[in-house]
């Protein structure tokens, strides 16, 4: 029987097992702020490593970059963020609650059975008309008395240096992409890459969201994994399809079920004026379908804007054809926190065992699991041998060492945090140099030589 997966269960497990804690908790917390605990930081790092492995290490096209969070203000003027990076904001006059008008509309669409609920690209007038026509009341107080819809810029503003004036004004970056665009020429020249090629980056971004929520799904501080793939104009739709398929298969290969994913291609009315195509990979979260991965064909918009604003030549000269052009860009953009949450939800399970006992187990792909194995001596008299095994294997893998409690309880603890293998050291180990290794998913056990453990674990990490 399928287990009911709720956000309450996921949040409780994350907090109780050290995946994610509420931020600033001893001071009463900070709304929508989360800290990754000992298991969470290992897990999230594994998610990032998996992405980097497939999108940089194993790709002949792509190279990496780590650009600064703080950039010249003119970067954001050129990109359009200073003038247009905003959400439609409205307040309830009765209870003073604040909402994104487009999210009120989309929630209403979802509640009324719309297969695709989106108000992307709607004007303030369209949003207001829909809210009034459908009598959408305030979710907090049930009244319908709103302020006019206005634009709210999502960037966090700060100042550089000791003076707070227009010259020292700057922003925390709302996306990592612009750092890639402004480094396009430098990366292309030094890496000697020819179009088509991509620049990948993992890094923190910040958005002053009006209505963050759903745990780590939407937060004001978040981490992105973005690729900007530069291609020749006219080949962009072909590359857009290539990266759509590549991203989809990345998720499937890490144990996300296809039935919990859908590919949604944006209609013409949703597309940005500069985009030839945009597609979202959506995941079925406990609270409904939510965007996981955006794959956008941004044409030459970004490089052209920076070329125009900076006065620098950002075109590319094809040495073979002697043709000069501004490359088009395909952008697969993924939130590390959001996809990590999806992996946790996908992995969560409750299994009823013989005798009515229930075990909570996280069926994480071994490549993502915080610990690849746990070393479990049956007796503290076996600690020395167990620590020797730990010392050798820990050179290759992140391991847990647990010698307290019954072996059954220790198995359950490891199941709940997603550890793929439990390695039991018993008194026979001292004689035959063998251990018992238990599989998390099947709970089956087998006896193998200590010398075979490394290859045994390593084989399961491939994807």
From Swiss-Prot:
Pfam families: HGTP_anticodon, tRNA-synt_2b
GO CC list: cytoplasm
Record-listed E.C. numbers: 6.1.1.14
Main location class: cytoplasm
Gene Ontology biological process terms from the UniProt entry: glycyl-tRNA aminoacylation
Amino-acid positions noted as binding ATP in the UniProt annotation, renumbered to this chain: 207-209, 217-222, 291-292, 335-338
Catalytic activity: tRNA(Gly) + glycine + ATP = glycyl-tRNA(Gly) + AMP + diphosphate
Summary of the function given for this chain in its UniProt record: Catalyzes the attachment of glycine to tRNA(Gly).
PANTHER family: DNA POLYMERASE SUBUNIT GAMMA-2, MITOCHONDRIAL, GLYCYL-TRNA SYNTHETASE/DNA POLYMERASE SUBUNIT GAMMA-2
Designated name of the protein: Glycine--tRNA ligase
